[in-house]
Amino acid sequence: MRTNSILSSLRTAIFSVVFSVCLGAVSEAQTYNILHNFGGSGHDGYAPLTDLVLNGNTLYGTTASGGTNGGGTIFKINTDGSGYGIIRSLTNSPSPEGGMVLIGNTLYGTTFTGGSADNGSIFKMNTDGSGYTELHSFSATVPSVFGTNSDGNRPQGDLVTDGSTLYGTAEYGGTNNNGTVFKINTDGSGFAVIKTFSATFLGTNNVSENMLVNSGTNTDGARPIGGLVLDGSTLYGTTYHGGISNGVVFAMQTDGSGYTVLKYFSGINGIGTNSDGAAPVAGLTLGGDTLYGVTVGGGVAGCGNIFKLKTNGAGFIDLHDFLHSDGAFPRNALFLNGSTLYGTTAAGGSSNYGTIFMILTNGADFTTLKNFDMTVGLQCDSKFVLSSNILYGTVADGGTNGGGVVFGLTVQPQILTGDGNFGVQANAFGFDITGISNQAVVIQTCTNLGSPDWLPIQTNTLNGGPVYFSDPQWTNYSGRFYRLRSP
């Protein structure tokens, strides 16, 4: 069980020393469990690149390669790691790289390649593996695989749905080869392109994470990789190229009207840095009237950042700049729980294989929860899903067989040292506690860590935001330690 301990004392100097030891910015004692190692025997899948779908106690996902035909797989696994099975081996090398969406007992998704022109497709299938149907095949591009067409090419963002219509993005293709936003009914009818991104005019190219950050400018953005967010009749998304320099955040209506750029990301200098981030590869996360996202480049160290802005485009704030030591190049959408954001980076951290992190929505208390390495997996390419207090995701590489893993991270409650509630207030010593919503937390205390006799002094339930704990008895002790436990 993860334990957070703090010492309260009459002397502030003692506080500072003990807090810096006990509550640093790395919290590696989270419980990380590998549920499945890909790349094993029996034509197993390889390289899971997409988000998982949770239905009850069952997780569904895809791999980009492997399977009987080498074209990737669709799999299921229970949240306790049992019941792993491939429910579909894909043919013709379609390589699914976008997350699926579940409606009833039907899964809907996209493939990056495959289809009649090998430019990707939209499919559906039942959760038992039956009824696989190709709903749309993206058309041929001229003059080459990365040329132009009418409907888009190479979809890899997650689909979203209002129940009867699916919405998604294609990175390439369209009339200017800068990608499209499309919609299609769940029965395969009514496919329509509702946005074609305009032509870009080439400027100075810069490189971040071995990819071009600036491939030209236009007014509306270019190359949408991430999935969309649907709120009522409004879609929100990102492009990692175009705009005035390095991508945009946009909003539009589901009928294709009202396209608006909410944020233009600025240019980067010769060493890849700027003030607001560059190249948002991932999709957005919506919380109330606020959008949260990440960029893969730019920021103060050229390693990307975490940002937020209002749904009307106002109030852009850089919440955190990655420094490589705490992670680098975040490529996946954030997961929001209460007032805490959880996410991953593709590189950086102690082993340079990426990290799992948490941060409050106000930018406080950034914490590294897990450093990836070859044994536990590397290159996390999925947004989290939550069950109880466990975050589930996939890693595209590493693990026992080198084919990536499905993992679960048990998130323990955290004591927040970076906000204004930490310390002595109204003659009581107190602090904020954060964690997964509806998680019960017991605060225990003792006076001697050499022979601790931990006593429970309060139980709280986390409900959508930090819970404040205060100890009015702190002045009765020369020193007091605190820790958090589950009941």
Can you say where each PLM-predicted feature lies in the sequence?
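Extracellular beta-propeller repeat domains
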Residues: 2-420, 425, 436, 466
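Short, composition-biased motifs enriched in small/polar/acidic residues
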Residues: 5, 411-487
